[in-house]
């Protein structure tokens, strides 16, 4: 890639600071007009297909809801909305940063990108916390793993993300450059310092904190799963090995999609005001543009993750009749304070052990069959 960098007031044709306003260097970004249309097109097709299938299973085949399935449903809704908006960006970048649509539509497309990004992060965090409770505190997970609690948490996530991303609708704008109309993904020059401050707050609140929570949850889960059970010898059981692989896969995908994007975007915004060489700034700009498709790819990877982690959903898609979920035993209900039947100590220990093993598939209860956004 030829650098071909010149000062901001250069008169040759090209793009300045990629597709942003107020930058001092001109970048040759021919790679972007191939990379972004192709990658967004693939994400659009795969994301829509996978998430539509997931929504069909959730709405038409799944009869019993728990916390994990509730969070996955909302995750699929968010991914579907974002994938449906990608054809506009495919057209935009294929035309060489020309936006023939309205400014309102430009704002909406950028808003959907960030809304999907942070909804995915927060819903993955909710799923991680729920799984962590299921491994570390099975009986507490039995009580708090019901869909009615998860629906309330999901509603809070939507309200929080929509409120936090509402300023994007104010900052994002369009501008005319010769015969082209550019749809910026930041702000106008006079508002850029405010946009950087806003983005820094979002970085900490909606990425750094959830990522730390997910990391802690999966470290605790891995320690518990890798610890041999009392009185056993040899390697890990097959179920535990699969759980450990799932943990590693979730962390890897999370880091692949979200971490590079946030790191390069932070550098991209921070270095714009510094007196660095255009070659250095060009490298940072290129890295940021390359990680944007990675952030979008979570719309395709989310369904794969929860299909792999939740084999019950695969069985629901394959079988004509979903399997009947087990109900909490009287002993487990007694420990949760629901009622206190008299049982022998031996039977109590036996059933409690069974409950701990099946915590992951705890039913949400009869009142959780209706799902509301």
UniProtKB/Swiss-Prot annotation:
**Any idea where this protein resides?**
Cell membrane
What does UniProt note about where in the body, tissue by tissue, this protein is expressed? Spleen, testis, kidney, liver, lung, heart and brain.
Q: Name the chain's protein.
A: P2Y purinoceptor 2
Basic residues bias: start-end ranges: 332-344
**Which sites does the entry annotate for glycosylation?**
9, 13
UniProt-reported outcome of changing residue 107 to I:
No effect on receptor activation
Give the result of residue 292 to L, as annotated: Decrease in receptor activation
Assign the protein's first listed, main location to one coarse class: membrane
Return the InterPro entries for the record. Answer: GPCR_Rhodpsn (IPR000276), GPCR_Rhodpsn_7TM (IPR017452), P2Y2_rcpt (IPR000356)
Function in brief: Receptor for ATP and UTP coupled to G-proteins that activate a phosphatidylinositol-calcium second messenger system. The affinity range is UTP = ATP > ATP-gamma-S >> 2-methylthio-ATP = ADP.
Q: Where is this region: Disordered?
A: 318-373
The yes or no answer to whether the keyword Iron is present is no
What topology does the record note for this protein and the membrane?
Multi-pass membrane protein
């Amino acid at each position: 890639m030829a650098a071909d960098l010149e000062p901001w007031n250069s008169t040759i044709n090209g793009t300045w600071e990629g597709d942003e306003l107020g930058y001092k260097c001109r970048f040759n970004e021919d790679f972007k007009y191939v990379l972004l249309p192709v990658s967004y097109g693939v994400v659009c097709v795969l994301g829509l297909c996978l998430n539509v299938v997931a929504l069909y299973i959730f709405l038409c085949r799944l009869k019993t809801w728990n916390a994990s399935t509730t969070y996955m449903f909302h995750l699929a809704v968010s991914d579907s909305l974002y994938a449906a908006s990608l054809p506009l960006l495919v057209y935009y970048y294929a035309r060489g940063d020309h936006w023939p649509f309205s400014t309102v539509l430009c704002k909406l497309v950028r808003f959907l990108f960030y809304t999907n990004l942070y909804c995915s992060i927060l819903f993955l965090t909710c799923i991680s916390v729920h799984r962590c409770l299921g491994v570390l505190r099975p009986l507490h997970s039995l009580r708090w793993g019901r869909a009615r609690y998860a629906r309330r948490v999901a509603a809070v996530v939507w309200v929080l993300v929509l409120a936090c991303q509402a300023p994007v609708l104010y900052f994002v704008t369009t501008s005319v450059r010769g015969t082209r109309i550019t749809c910026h993904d930041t702000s106008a020059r006079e508002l850029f310092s405010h946009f950087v401050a806003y983005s820094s707050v979002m970085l900490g609140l909606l990425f750094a904190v959830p990522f730390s929570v997910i990391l802690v949850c999966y470290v605790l889960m891995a320690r518990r799963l890798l610890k041999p059970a009392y009185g056993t010898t040899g390697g890990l059981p097959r179920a535990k090995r699969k759980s450990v692989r799932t943990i590693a896969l979730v962390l890897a995908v999370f880091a692949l999609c979200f971490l590079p994007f946030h790191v390069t975007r932070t550098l991209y915004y921070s270095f714009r005001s510094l007196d660095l060489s255009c070659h250095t700034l060009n490298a940072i700009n290129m890295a940021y543009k390359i990680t944007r498709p990675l952030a979008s790819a979570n719309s395709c990877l989310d369904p794969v993750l929860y299909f792999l982690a939740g084999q019950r959903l695969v069985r629901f898609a394959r079988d004509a009749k979903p399997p009947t979920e087990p109900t909490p035993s009287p002993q487990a209900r007694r420990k949760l304070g629901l009622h206190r039947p008299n049982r022998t100590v031996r039977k109590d220990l036996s059933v409690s052990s069974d409950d701990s093993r099946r915590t992951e598939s705890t039913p949400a209860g009869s009142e959780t069959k209706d799902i509301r956004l």
